[in-house]
Amino acid sequence: MLTRFQLKDVAGLFSEGVEPEPQLAPAARRRRRLETLRESVPAGVRRFAMVAFNLLGRRELATLPATLDLMIRDRFIRSNVLPDPRAALAGEEGLAGLAPDLSPATMMEAYGVGLNPSASLGPVAWHSPPIRRVSTPGKLAQSPALRVEGPAKTFRATFDRDADSILAASANRGDCASLTPERLINAFAELFDAGYAHSFEVRDAGGRLVGGGYGVAVGRVFVLERIFSRRPGAAQVGLQRLAQCLRDWDFALVECGAGAFDLCGEAFDDVSRDFYLASLGEHLRGDRIGRWPSEGAKRNPPGARQPRAA
């Protein structure tokens, strides 16, 4: 069962050696978050245009009737029961059903059965693609696709220091892979407050944010949701450091979500949905809830390890 934490309790989640951020008053933090994560009118128009392009694109046109039928039925039925990930529609998106509830508890339950939230087809919905991209942390850390060269060698990666800025930057990349409406961004922000979602920030030698990303820890599986890069090599620096720390913290698997595939997909292997769901089921126990050490201290698993109910 997911344990919900209030903002005032977050400091108590920190692992030993984690430097707490300067604490804002709850009202001030809410205002800052609303300003940071608000979707602008131009961004909303651009997102809807991309959705239309995605729906009418050649790859998805064959499944459009079934997609619209499922969306219409779900809109009227409004069931809070999660769909079966194995019964998702055919097609690359793997649409399984709409997502009327994005509470932390429901989000974590969905991730635990292999459903990922996405708005690539318009409304926020649960998806279970037939092909999943995965890697072990150790293999990912050594991937040639993440080799860092040139100025990027001076970049520095940290964890959980500026999640709101990372969420906003990842949602405003301006491409089909980053279709993230305000409702879904705020749901990820709540998961961060609850200690399940994590961000990584990549900065240059001058302290400027040049890249980063975020994902969700589900037991010993990390689902990489989004990644962005403002400078060559920034995404590789962040993902390589993430993989190194996940390896040291005994994570078993990393999944690359659709919102991260275009920047780092070469570092992952394609597997079937059934293979991924079976692997996920083997590694659900042992949630580590809480903020990660900002520097990713080795051999120091973050947060309190809590077993999941069978």
Where are these regions (language model features)?
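N-acyltransferase acceptor-side catalytic subdomain
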Residues: 1-310
